[in-house]
């Protein structure tokens, strides 16, 4: 066959691929510039008037290059996932793939946390004066404490106001650690291990959702990126990683319910977890946006929806019956937020710097994937990639609403973890996954070794 008889499609395909890669790189470069701008402008503001209350804008962190006992393990996990992750994700049986993602994600998070050492990285993270373990002894009588919970939210309303994180969350967050203590798993070490091990299952919830609503091929392509997410820098050790897992499984069960997988059971279980989610964190009420995206994508909504709603009311009814009123507590939290750094931090800076923080949380690969997801949505082709784009868009909208609320000024590298994880599946749309995975790993390793993060 002569060359003039060869089809032109391969050349066109190569041209399109090169064009798309350039656009991916432009998107990544724009994200780098956004973060650089936030760093420069934030440093100027902090040096001028100190209103940001962060030492290394836009992150709550200190510049402190260091290595630690977790360094060799973190590098080893990164190399292994980059080298073998995509191939294993393509061929492992589905359940084994989920187990592998959880194992790799857990190892990645533990090793990154241990770069700061066992004490600072894990055992002491949840024992500071702001954290949940400081108030375990005040929950000896749980019903009485719940009835009186709102009396201690605002500073000045009580001589024993709650520390920041207890005041800033509904009581289910603190009760988690109270019950861990009661079953013999008390102290910062067990709390840290709990948050990392449970938090690592969030990736599985995301993958189950993508498989149910988009397709298995995209879920498999996303798997290595969820296992090796830069977000692990803040997942270990943070209670928000645990919150992210509860919320992710609520979404996953809803996705299974609306696609016909035991709709009554999965619908009820999803509702129960959604009810728990909003009593772990006020901000996670915005998961209603992600849930709405799931309902839009689901084809069998009618049967599971009543069960999901019935499950959802259980946790709120229990807490309300015990004397804790969510809406009253949130109103008092707004006052408490304004009493602290949140009342001083300038929204004009944080409204865009918060987004710059997410560049480090989700990585440049996710930025490129989001560009591709946006292109797919604009084409409006009803493909698996389009459905994935809708799911990712739901998470992005929830994040933007949180940003505009003014209740998320700074520290969003931790606070928005439950939303950020849902952006990572966009990486499934990228070709050449190993190069992008390597970029994700290098970013996480640099952040963890150059900075001492606040979380």
Language-model segments: what does each one mean?
Residues 79-87, 190-213:
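Transmembrane-helix motifs of polytopic, lipid-linked glycan transferases
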Residues 301-306, 371-394, 433:
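Membrane-interface helix-loop-helix junctions at transmembrane boundaries of multi-pass membrane enzymes
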